[in-house]
Structures are given as structure tokens and as C-alpha cells.
Design a protein with these regions (language model features):
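Acidic (Asp/Glu-rich) sequence patches and key acidic residues
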Residues: 1-351
Length: 351
């Protein structure tokens, strides 16, 4: 399955220097350099779960390595200075392109300071988030966003709508092919000698949108409600009963926001009396979200934005008693999962 690539290209006049591109990449802390390959980086949004890879041109990689070396020298003044680069990129006309038979220039990978590699077997918001990231990077670093490594002179770059439509079409084809050939299962390589079998899972567009809207707004909610002692939990994905479900964590008795997830990881404190002292233990387990909503809804603030959620501030004794009586499903019945292999379609793909 071919990866889907979004190119950030320099305009004919050259664009911003590599350091500006690097500053834009590192701006919000979601991009990290790959440990085993300095030419690759990874984007991950811990609030939404979106992720994708980036391939960096040598000019950006060298700027990154120079910055790391400068930080090391600051910590060790006796370290020798790095060698001077032989030649700086100036964006001029003397680039080493190999002309084709028509006299044009073959595009060089160095034309693209950054290439975003986006997975296909994911929900639509991955693409929307990657496209927004690319457009913001392009504005800051004076780059062009395109579906192609190079465009002919005078040709317009791909529009955001064209990129989105192309990705959606490629995603639908990949899902249909996977469903037809492998029954919706594929192997995910974790490293060179280990892979796991993953079954394709479908969420409704409404469920995917609610996940993304809540995750995108979680920090704003925390800024609003956190000073009042209300916890705003992060979302996570778990594999449970053969499919991937959404989950958040809650401690009964703690003021909190409760989004509409599939499951809630409940952590409740119990007192255990010993011979000489009483100690607190934490009991953990899973509860269907709908069960907790039915108990808390009448005593909580209901909000529809950014997605359906409860703001629960206090727990009257009768409500606390009902919460204490809830049966907890063993935590071992769920395990952490990536959102890779989870797609948002209107119906299940047919084999």
C-alpha cells in the first residue's frame, strides 16, 4: 500500500532559510526527531491521537543537527567547533537538476524541504490535521503545499480541497482493497523482527468528529475549568471485545468533565483496615460510559460544545452510593491501541 505524501516546496524565489523552517516545525512541540534517522521526524498530537511522519531535506536536517551541536557545546565549552558547511543553499538558479529531453528540469528531493507521509487507514481528521499543519508551515516558511514533488513552470499547486479529495479517494480504495483481500486485517510492523495483526475497525463519522472536537478543545477546557478544580481527562483508545473503543479516566468524587466515550476507566479509593492502621487502596475497572451518564446527568452541567459532555462538580450522597455500587469490569479486558486501522465510514466495508 503506497503512502500518501504531501510536499512542501520552495517557490521559484527560494523561500525561507532552513532555520525558519525548523522553527516552524518545532513551534508547538508536536514534532520530534526520529532517534535512528535524523532525516525523519514524527508528528503526534497527544490530545487527538493524530500522527504522521515527515521526511526532511538535508538543509533542514543539517540545521537541526547544528542546533543540537550548539546546545552540546554550550554545556561543554571545551568541545571543538563544528566544521563550516561547504556551501549554503541560496535558492538560486544553479541547482543540480538533470534536464529532460524537453529541456525541463527533473524535480530533486531537495526541492521539498519537508514531505509529510500520511497513513491511509485512519480517520479523516488525521488528514485534516496534517493539511492544517502543512498550510501553517507553508505560511510561516514561505513554502507551497502540493501533491507532487515538482510542478511545471506556471502550473498552480494543488488546492487544499484537491488534496483532501485525493486522500479520501485513496483511503476508500485502500479500505475496499483490504476488505476484499484480507477480510479487513493487516500486519503492522512494530520493528524489524516483530509485527502484529490488526483488524480494521469502523467508527461512525459522528463518533470520529466528537473525538476530534473534544481532543482539539481539551486544553481550552482545562484552562477554563481547571482553576475551579475540575479535571478534564484525556481521551485514549483501547482494544476491547475485538474492536477499538474510546475511553477516558475518572475518579469518583472528583469534579470532572465526562465526554461521551465508549468506556470509562474508574479509579475509586477504598479503605482497608489492618491490625494497626487503615490504608487506602485504589480499585480500578471499566464501566460503560452510558451507565455513568445515567447516574450523573441530572446533577451535572450538560454541554453540546465542543462535543457532548458533562461537567460534574459535586456528588450528593445518594449519587455517591449508586456509583459505589457499580460493578467494575476487569481492566485486563482492554489494552491500549493506536488509532491506526480505525476509519470513519458511513457503513462497514464489505469483503
Amino acid at each position: 500500500m503506497n503512502p500518501f505524501e504531501i510536499y512542501l516546496l520552495r517557490p521559484p524565489e527560494g523561500g525561507a532559510p532552513a532555520d525558519t523552517i525548523l522553527d516552524a516545525l518545532l513551534g508547538d512541540g508536536r514534532v520530534a526527531l526520529a532517534a535512528d534517522d535524523p532525516s525523519r521526524a514524527h508528528y503526534r498530537n497527544p490530545d487527538t491521537g493524530a500522527f504522521f511522519s515527515l521526511l526532511l531535506a538535508s538543509e533542514v536536517t543539517e540545521a537541526w543537527e547544528a542546533r543540537l551541536a550548539a546546545a552540546r557545546r554550550a554545556a561543554d565549552e571545551d568541545a571543538p567547533p563544528p566544521p563550516e558547511p561547504e556551501e549554503d543553499y541560496d535558492g538560486g538558479e544553479d541547482e543540480d537538476f538533470e534536464a529532460d529531453e524537453d529541456g525541463g528540469a527533473e524535480p530533486d528531493v531537495e526541492q521539498a524541504p519537508v514531505i509529510i507521509t500520511l497513513p491511509l487507514l485512519v480517520m479523516e481528521f488525521f488528514m485534516r490535521e496534517a493539511l492544517a499543519f502543512a498550510e501553517a508551515l507553508a505560511r510561516t516558511a514561505d513554502l507551497a503545499v502540493d501533491l507532487h514533488a515538482g510542478t511545471e513552470d506556471g502550473a498552480q499547486a494543488s488546492s487544499p480541497a484537491e488534496i483532501a479529495a485525493t486522500w479520501l479517494g485513496a483511503r476508500d480504495e485502500a479500505v475496499a482493497e483490504l476488505a476484499e483481500k484480507n477480510g479487513g486485517a493487516f500486519d503492522l510492523k512494530l520493528h524489524a523482527h516483530h509485527s502484529v495483526r490488526i483488524q480494521l475497525c469502523v467508527w461512525s463519522p459522528a463518533k470520529a468528529a466528537a473525538w476530534w472536537k473534544y481532543g482539539s478543545a481539551r486544553r481550552a477546557l482545562a484552562a477554563e475549568l481547571g482553576p475551579r478544580g475540575v479535571v478534564v481527562p484525556a481521551l485514549s483508545a483501547v482494544r476491547h471485545e475485538g474492536t477499538v473503543k474510546s475511553l477516558c479516566e475518572w475518579r469518583p468524587g472528583t469534579p470532572c468533565v465526562l465526554p461521551r466515550t465508549d468506556l470509562v476507566l474508574v479509579r475509586r479509593e477504598r479503605e482497608r483496615k489492618g491490625l494497626f492502621r487503615t490504608r487506602k487502596i485504589v480499585q480500578e475497572g471499566l464501566v460503560p460510559n452510558e451507565q455513568i451518564w445515567k447516574i450523573l446527568a441530572a446533577h451535572s452541567e450538560l454541554r453540546a460544545e465542543p462535543a457532548d459532555l458533562l461537567v460534574h462538580r459535586s456528588t450528593p450522597p445518594p449519587i455517591a452510593a449508586r456509583l459505589e455500587a457499580m460493578a467494575l469490569e476487569p481492566l485486563e479486558h482492554a489494552r491500549n491501541a493506536l488509532l491506526l486501522g480505525v476509519v470513519d465510514l458511513g457503513s462497514e466495508p464489505r469483503a
